[in-house]
UniProtKB/Swiss-Prot annotation:
Allosterically activated by HslU binding. The keyword Cytoplasm applies. The gene is hslV. This is ATP-dependent protease subunit HslV. It comes from Shewanella denitrificans (strain OS217 / ATCC BAA-1090 / DSM 15013). InterPro entries: ATP-dep_Prtase_HsIV_su, Ntn_hydrolases_N, Proteasome_sua/b, Proteasome_suB-type. It catalyses: ATP-dependent cleavage of peptide bonds with broad specificity. It holds the Pfam family Proteasome.
Amino acid sequence: MTTIVSVRRNNQVVIAGDGQVSLGNTVMKGNARKVRRLYHNKVLAGFAGGTADAFTLFERFEAKLEMHQGHLLKSAVELAKDWRTDKMLRKLEAMLVVADTEASLIITGNGDVVQPEHDLIAIGSGGNYAQAAALALLQNTELSAQEIADKSLTIAGDICVFTNQFKTIEQLDY
């Protein structure tokens, strides 16, 4: 599995992820990029779950963004509808975190599109650890969104055996 965290603070949104790819209890790769920029670098996206499944979803989501001229919520809802109703897509096991300058969302295969509380999202095997760390940092420090995402991933990686310390961090300023 993996850990993906998204933090929004002070006109900055960040999505960060670790790089570990596991097959069962074996680490297959330690430097995977699970966070990407989409739609002319205006949308950030990260995934947790099956790598091949996530790439399929990235492609579908990017097509939805193109179709809806970069409108994040409409694209997310359309992807979630397809994911829930299409027999092939329904078998995909991944979750997406997406963000632009307006919103941050979680998209699941159950057809859920969720906008989080506290401008904070964390998914994957280390998601609960990263979320707790990020929430504490949001409430008790003046750190930037990028610093909070970085530190919360470090903490998750220290606790979760399916999360490592190789990080990909993408940021949008607005």
